[in-house]
A protein has these predicted regions:
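Flavin-dependent oxidoreductase catalytic cores
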Residues: 1-379
Length: 379
């Protein structure tokens, strides 16, 4: 087989056989119903349009009201949300697709607006830097959070368990734990945001405990072959960092191996991308690839060419695409046919109506439009 066709070959991920190696990366689009953070009919269409991907991973979906940090983002903790997501999964499956939901708790990156006037929670009372909260009042300053009590940490693990149960009820093929981008799970793992002195802080073994308990909770509900986790070892959202990223994330990954997870999803972008390792910062992804014994997904600024290169060099088993999928719902077909890509409209990435969400044309639609124009010219 030609090396430039690896993207379109099947691959086994946990309980699922994927028809290709393209993954829809989880992307917040802020289009949920603000009355209850419920997915809408437009959400259904958005994911169905992209169902030809090997695997769809939904936007981050909060496991509880406490986990909310942005307006118009969906949850998976209420009956209405479960019902809304069930419409999505039914439609995606009818279209031949496969879909995981990303389970999300923002931790410190929130605002009292979402917390009934209370402070956001975090492993430690450390204020995120360089980020603001997106509320109904616009972008607002994030306050210093309060540290979760030990019993509250354990209760949050149970919130993740309940979210996994709800995901199962909603018909998802599996769940991805959001352990990246400076949110709660990441805040526990890294020592800049975790200065606890109980069983969840201090040593790397203790700092990893919350993440491992969350994974175990999801595995208990769904089975390990339907649970993945996402990490961003070189990310710095909110100023997050670790004194020894390589050692910390290597340890965490070694522990993940004990579960037999569906996959490990790592954000470590290519040079020049905002999420790439910074100058003087060694990439961690290659080390995690060597450690992890299951399917490995890479994400961060990949094109068809760089994705094929990564797959052929065994840097990953699958590649997750974000921005290209926003404007190109039929990205698989466009790559297969060597077709040009639609240009995404950054002004419509977050919030708004269906414009910039579900109105990007597919190749088929563009072809039909071209035929109509040709008819007009001829007649």
């Amino acid at each position: 087989m030609s090396q430039n066709q690896v993207l379109f070959t099947p691959f086994q991920v946990g309980a699922l056989t994927l028809p290709n190696r393209l993954v829809l990366a989880p992307m917040t689009r802020s289009r949920a119903n603000n009355e209850g953070n419920v997915p809408t009919d437009s959400t259904v269409k958005y994911y169905v349009q992209r169902a030809s991907a090997g695997l769809l991973i939904t936007e981050g979906s909060q496991i509880s009201q406490q986990g909310v940090g942005y307006i118009y983002t969906p949850g998976i903790y209420s009956e209405a949300q479960v019902a809304g997501w069930k419409k999505v999964t039914d439609a995606v499956h009818a279209a031949g697709g496969r879909i995981f939901i990303q389970l999300w708790h923002v931790g410190a990156i929130s605002h009292p607006f979402f917390q009934n006037g209370e402070l956001p929670v975090a492993p430690s009372a450390i204020k995120p830097v360089g980020v603001k909260a997106f509320t109904a009042n616009g972008m607002e300053e994030i306050p210093t959070p309060r540290a979760l009590a030990t019993e509250e940490v354990k209760a949050t693990v149970e919130d993740f368990r309940k979210a996994a149960e709800n995901a199962k009820k909603a018909g998802f093929d599996g769940v991805e734990i959001h352990g990246a981008n400076g949110y709660l799970v990441d805040q526990f793992i890294q020592d800049s945001t975790n200065q606890r002195t109980d069983e969840y802080g201090g040593s790397v073994e203790n700092r990893a405990r919350f993440a491992l308990e969350v994974v175990q909770a999801a595995v208990d509900v769904l089975g390990a072959d339907r649970v993945g986790i996402r990490l961003s070892p070189t990310g710095n959202v909110g100023g997050i960092h670790d004194s020894n990223r390589l050692a910390t994330f290597s340890y965490v990954t070694e522990q993940f191996n004990k579960f037999g997870l569906a996959y490990l999803h790592v954000i470590e972008a290519l040079p020049g991308h905002p999420m790439a390792a910074k100058a003087g910062q060694e990439p961690v992804g290659p080390a995690l690839r060597k450690i992890f014994t299951g399917p490995f997904i890479l994400n961060g600024g990949y094109t068809q060419e760089t994705a094929e290169h990564a797959l052929n060099n065994n840097e990953a088993d699958l590649i997750a695409f974000g921005v290209p999928y926003i404007a190109n719902p039929d990205l698989v077909e466009r790559y297969q046919q060597g077709a040009s890509l639609n240009t995404p409209d950054q002004a419509t990435f977050y919030g708004g109506d269906d414009h910039g969400y579900i109105d990007y044309p597919s190749l088929q639609e563009q072809g039909a439009e071209a035929e109509v124009k040709q008819d007009i010219v001829q007649y």
